[in-house]
């Protein structure tokens, strides 16, 4: 998966580290970060110690229908083509929807329009939930700032800040992969709902 994977830079080094010691679900990775007390930044309003998801596309893909069935990225994003009697993988990496006859329809027998509609409907459902979560997170950060401004103590805010960290992390993890609304629709909706 190379760069389509969740990673972070260890503080004080230029080396990538992969937070999968606890497993490869969003909860496992969060637990890893919490265990090592890792923080990417402190939120300006809420003061929550935040995590920033990088590119968890492959990690999420592995929890989706195609990943669990052993497909690779190249199966859909670099479909086979033939030129001059030679069959090879197309290195013009693109959306599988651009060449449905060489991607989706290799396995699925539905029409191109039906398959395209299926993808767009999955994306629509995830985006609907994502939009609601974004609004709630924004309100929560503003409410935390209000509490700080009214004199809340670190001890009083501890649980709230952890909830903000967790909620923002899960939202970010779900949306930072870009293609997860199709690659792992059910997993992304589960993450956004948690």
Mark where each language-model region is.
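Primarily the internal scaffold of c-type cytochrome electron-transfer domains
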Residues: 1-75, 79-193
